[in-house]
């Protein structure tokens, strides 16, 4: 049985997926972004589900798709071809509110908190390994001084 844990914003749970290739990517309901990943021999799989966060996909220095610019009231799944075939090469936490995932061929995915839309302490992403949900990353609660 896989244990589900909730963590403050950290790249450690993503690191085991470094080197995996994006096999499929799409936007689901609302702004949910899903990346299906696998090793080159497809023996290990992973999934990153960007859940309650804003995001932008950058390729060669230009924004190619963003949660803020999606068509409203769409009912169909929207493919994200810009990441398919690329390998996840790094994950970086910029601060307590932003995470960057780097991909081969000069692409990256920026993920950041939107407290207005999703509230404080929202779930940033869910990580799955070999079909099992393993980790939920949450934005940390703001500290009160």
What are these language model-derived features?
Residues 1-145:
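Surface-exposed, interaction-prone regions used to assemble/regulate multi-protein complexes
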